Design a protein with these regions (language model features):
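Intrinsically disordered, low-complexity, polar/charged repeat-rich segments
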Residues: 1-186
């Protein structure tokens, strides 16, 4: 894991039934970050690993909404909003990220299924591609990534789960597995 000079300061969720109605987006999940040591240029080509640590299957629901076609993204710098493409990438599905040994006869889908049942938390990871920082003025060290979601506002359990999210649910600089000893997984 590569440590970067960036910190997730605040996370907030709010429903806004009419703000993005023309885009069918009625809720916003906001991530407020702080950059240290004026290191924007260093961070532009980096990917920030994020682990979604929440109750039961809710991380999967968050991931599903992040990668939904109707979801929009913007960067907030001060009072300015800049629309950006989805800066998030899924982690754990690529063959190079496999944890279980595979042979040439094992189908990729079977490997993913086995890994999901052995290591379900492995699929609660995201990478935040920091390439959008090119829009950030050099003198700024704080910004927000806004995720504009389309949620069923009548689903009170879902809204409550989003409202209870906080910074502790999004762990930076973590990795799914550290293999300290060479041992065959069975």
């Amino acid at each position: 894991v590569r440590l970067l000079p960036i910190l997730l300061n605040q996370l907030s969720f709010k429903t806004n039934p009419s703000a993005h109605m023309h885009l069918n987006q009625n809720a916003t999940l906001s991530f407020k970050f702080e950059i240290f040591n004026q290191s924007i240029k260093q961070l532009i080509h980096e990917k920030l690993p994020i682990y979604l640590d929440a109750i039961s299957n809710f991380p999967l629901q968050v991931l599903d909404n992040v990668f939904n076609k109707s979801t929009g993204f913007s960067l907030k710098v001060g009072n300015d909003f800049i629309e950006i493409t989805n800066p998030f990438e899924v982690v754990g599905f690529d063959e190079t990220e496999s944890l279980l040994p595979i042979d040439q006869h094992t189908h990729q889908a079977y490997r993913l299924l086995m890994e999901y049942f052995c290591f379900p938390e492995k699929f609660n990871y995201l990478n935040l591609n920091l390439n959008f920082l090119k829009h950030l003025p050099i003198e700024k060290n704080e910004f927000e990534v806004l995720i504009h979601l389309k949620l069923n506002l009548n689903d009170q359990a879902c809204i409550q789960n989003y409202a209870e999210l906080n910074v502790a649910n999004f762990k930076l600089f973590s990795t799914p597995v550290v293999n300290l000893f060479n041992k065959q997984a069975e």
